[in-house]
């Protein structure tokens, strides 16, 4: 038998999350973002649950090819475009839509020998300051690309830096408006946060990512608690050991947790080598036998300890939810000083996945 830890994926929930996105942006088409191996869920496991999407967006060429080989015939958007000029041969073969965010990509596309034009997304830097042409260059770049024989349909894209913050998207929208004044074009601007909270930015295509998987773009579950979105992944395990400790005894490496009175401690088959956050402190929420309790002490490579005081019936084999439907990944991440995105993407290869 394998260790009891596993990641369960509820594909029906993923379908429902996509439906919620559509209701949030009813006039827009949807790019379902499956980058980072579908945010750690496994693109081959989940893509069929998103089959009602209008297109898939990702980074990795190999994953795009996999989708084509599995039978997806709709659009595929490569969010960072091609990384080497020679990649354009595969983009041509598999009919991939490419982002163009820099001069070298523009020149490579111009010089490529393609069988048919590629649809492109011209990326404008609206304040994130990662990729994209500066707003004042946008129209020149647009006209250069429009004149190329290798270019098919064109869309203008940008990525909001603060769609989940009080500052919002006002300044970014102002920059985009200046960049595109007088330009007739389709737009794709909205990430998960803007899809939920900024309908004025929906335009033609939205690009939801983390919300499809049932986590919050702000990192706070409370911000999406009333949307109907639900977690797709449940990371669960079991108690494999129980210790009854006296006052003054300590738990884990470094003895970071000290028992103040007699206390039962459960040892769970899960640790940082499985993707559970190493820096999750004492008090991080966890569910034991359906009862909310907390971790205690330091997370080790293969195990962590939990307080069994609220669940005296718990013993060897008792189920533990590390995150999922009841213990939200955002809450675990917040306790550990990180984001739910990072935890979902970091589930280790040694953890078996099951789909329902």
Curated annotation (Swiss-Prot):
- Required co-factors: pyridoxal 5'-phosphate
- Give the CC-aspect GO terms: cytosol
User: What is one GO biological process annotated to this record?
Assistant: D-alanine biosynthetic process
Q: Where is the active site?
A: 35, 253
Please give the Gene Ontology molecular function terms for this protein. alanine racemase activity; pyridoxal phosphate binding
Domain of life of the organism encoding this protein: Bacteria
What Pfam families does the database record attribute to this sequence? Ala_racemase_C (PF00842), Ala_racemase_N (PF01168)
Enzyme Commission code(s) on record:
5.1.1.1
State the reactions this protein catalyses.
L-alanine = D-alanine
Q: What class of enzyme is it?
A: isomerase
Q: Which InterPro entries has this protein been placed in?
A: Ala_racemase, Ala_racemase/Decarboxylase_C, Ala_racemase_C, Ala_racemase_N, Ala_racemase_pyridoxalP-BS, PLP-binding_barrel
Q: Does the keyword Glycoprotein apply?
A: no
Tell me if Cytoplasm is a UniProt keyword of this record: no
Tell me which UniProt keywords the record has, alphabetically.
Isomerase, Pyridoxal phosphate
Which positions bind substrate?
130, 301
Q: Which residues cross the membrane?
A: none
What PROSITE patterns does the record tag this protein with? ALANINE_RACEMASE (PS00395)
Which Gene3D superfamilies does UniProt cross-reference here? Alanine racemase, Lyase, Ornithine Decarboxylase, Chain A, domain 1
N6-(pyridoxal phosphate)lysine modifications at: 35
Task: Say what the protein does.
Answer: Isomerizes L-alanine to D-alanine which is then oxidized to pyruvate by DadA.
Q: Which family does it belong to?
A: Belongs to the alanine racemase family.
What this protein is called in its record is Alanine racemase, catabolic
């Amino acid at each position: 038998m394998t260790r009891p830890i596993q990641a369960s994926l509820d594909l029906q929930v993923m379908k429902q999350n996509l439906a919620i996105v559509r209701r949030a942006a009813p006039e827009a088409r949807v790019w379902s973002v499956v980058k980072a191996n579908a945010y750690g869920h496994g693109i081959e496991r989940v893509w069929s649950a998103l089959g009602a999407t209008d297109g898939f967006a990702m980074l990795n060429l190999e994953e795009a090819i996999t989708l084509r080989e599995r039978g997806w015939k709709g659009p595929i958007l490569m969010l960072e475009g091609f990384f080497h000029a020679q990649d354009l041969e595969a983009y041509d073969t598999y009919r991939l839509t490419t982002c163009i965010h820099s001069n070298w990509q523009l020149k490579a596309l111009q010089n490529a020998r393609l069988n048919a034009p590629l649809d492109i997304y011209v990326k404008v830097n609206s304040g994130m300051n990662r990729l994209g042409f500066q707003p004042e260059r946008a129209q020149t770049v647009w006209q250069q690309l429009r004149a190329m024989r290798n270019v098919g349909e064109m869309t203008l894209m940008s990525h909001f830096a603060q769609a989940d913050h009080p500052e919002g998207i006002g300044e970014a929208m102002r920059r985009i408006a200046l960049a595109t004044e007088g330009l007739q074009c389709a737009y794709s601007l909205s990430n998960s946060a803007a899809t939920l909270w900024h309908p004025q930015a929906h335009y033609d295509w939205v690009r939801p990512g983390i919300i499809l998987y049932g986590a919050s773009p702000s990192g706070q579950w409370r911000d999406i608690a009333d949307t109907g979105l639900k977690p797709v992944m449940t990371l669960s395990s079991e108690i494999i050991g129980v210790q009854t400790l006296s006052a003054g005894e300590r738990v884990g490496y470094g003895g970071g947790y000290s028992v103040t009175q007699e206390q039962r401690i459960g040892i769970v088959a899960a640790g940082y080598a499985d993707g559970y956050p190493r820096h999750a402190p004492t008090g991080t929420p966890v569910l034991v036998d359906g009862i909310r309790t907390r971790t205690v002490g330091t997370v080790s490579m293969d195990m962590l300890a939990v307080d069994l005081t609220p669940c005296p019936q718990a013993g060897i084999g008792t189920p533990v939810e590390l995150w999922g439907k009841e213990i939200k990944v955002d809450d675990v991440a917040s306790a550990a000083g990180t984001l739910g995105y990072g935890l979902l993407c970091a589930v280790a290869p040694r953890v078996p996945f099951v789909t329902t």
